[in-house]
């Protein structure tokens, strides 16, 4: 197996072999059932091209997928999470503030699947739209998340990952927090303008 990190905290990735690039899937602190279902439904197709590191959320592990070469699942990763971000060539994530700041800081090509308005205050949708507008991310709305959409989007973003990284690098001299704040203000202003029409 492939091991990552110092010996005392090394994380094992059984069956991970090159040259398949790693995808990191983060469902959120409590897991994201729809995201997990879509990953599992597409797992055979994903593993033809990628290794998959899947953070499923507490109580969301599916034992039937244990031991699949190129796939490893965890309920949660703590201190090693930055290492997983660094390892991944592509990240699939919810669009919480912590996650998007990490993606921007590490310049990681990513797909954001924000919590729907039915399940949140809508802040993740705002985060995701802001990042997509700046060319940092590709967004799949939860209502649009089908097996086909996920697989085609993964392939599209991976093949064009340099474009997303270049967009982040273009703005690297600007402070990340102020840049995100500016993005939010722009999107909010556009929303208000649309509603005023």
Annotate each PLM feature.
Residues 136-162:
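C-terminal "capping" alpha-helix adjacent to the active site of nucleotide-linked donor transferases
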Residues 93, 109-121:
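Short hydrophobic beta-strand element within catalytic cores of glycosyltransferases
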Residues 173-197:
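C-terminal alpha-helical cap of glycosyltransferases
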Residues 1-11:
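Active-site-proximal region of nucleotide-activated glycan assembly enzymes
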Residues 107, 125-137:
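Acidic, glycine-centered active-site loop in nucleotide-sugar glycosyltransferases
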């Amino acid at each position: 197996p492939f091991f990552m990190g110092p010996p005392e905290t090394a994380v094992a990735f059984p069956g991970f072999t090159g040259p398949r690039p790693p995808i990191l899937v983060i469902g959120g602190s409590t897991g994201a059932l729809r995201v997990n279902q879509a990953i599992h439904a597409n797992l055979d197709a994903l593993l033809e091209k990628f290794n998959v590191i899947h953070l499923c959320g507490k109580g969301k592990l599916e034992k039937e997928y244990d031991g699949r070469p190129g796939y490893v699942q965890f309920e949660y990763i703590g201190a090693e999470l930055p290492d997983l971000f660094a390892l991944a060539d592509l990240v699939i994530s919810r669009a919480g503030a912590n996650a998007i700041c990490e993606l921007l800081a590490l310049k990681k090509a990513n797909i954001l699947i924000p919590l729907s308005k039915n399940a949140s205050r809508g802040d993740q949708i705002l985060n995701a739209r802001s990042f997509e507008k700046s060319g940092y991310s590709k967004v799949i709305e939860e209502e649009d998340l089908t097996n086909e959409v996920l697989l085609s989007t993964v392939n599209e973003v991976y093949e064009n990952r340099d474009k997303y990284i270049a967009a982040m690098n273009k703005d690297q001299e600007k402070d990340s927090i102020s840049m995100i704040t500016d993005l939010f203000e722009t999107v909010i202003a556009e929303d208000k303008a649309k509603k005023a029409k």
